[in-house]
């Protein structure tokens, strides 16, 4: 099945960024807005990607 690229709910700070029609989210407490996306894994936690497109390509 297709895994969605999502933000981890417990780390979130939103910045004014929008890539490919999707909102980017950012890790709290990292200083500035370094974007990341996660691709959830059932058994291994999550893979992290710096752009929505990279995440999308890996998840689908």
From Swiss-Prot:
**Where does this protein have coiled-coil stretches?**
none
Lipid metabolism as a keyword? no
UniProt keyword annotations, A-Z: Disulfide bond, Protease inhibitor, Serine protease inhibitor
Q: Which Cys-Cys disulphide bridges does the record give?
A: 5-59, 15-39, 33-55
Q: Which residues form the BPTI/Kunitz inhibitor domain?
A: 5-59
Query: What molecular functions are annotated in GO for this chain?
Result: serine-type endopeptidase inhibitor activity
Superkingdom per UniProt: Eukaryota
Instruction: Cite the InterPro entries for this sequence.
Output: Kunitz_BPTI_sf
Cross-referenced SUPFAM superfamilies: BPTI-like
Q: What else is known?
A: The inhibition of factor Xa seems to be reversible and stoichiometric.
Job description of the protein = TAP is a slow, tight-binding inhibitor of blood coagulation, specific for factor Xa.
Q: What is this protein called?
A: Tick anticoagulant peptide
Organism of provenance: Ornithodoros moubata
């Amino acid at each position: 099945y297709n895994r969605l690229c999502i933000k981890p709910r417990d780390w979130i700070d939103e910045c004014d960024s929008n890539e490919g029609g999707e909102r980017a989210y950012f890790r709290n407490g990292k200083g500035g807005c370094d974007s990341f996306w996660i691709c959830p894994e059932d058994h291994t936690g999550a893979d992290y990607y710096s752009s929505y497109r990279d995440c999308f390509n890996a998840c689908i």
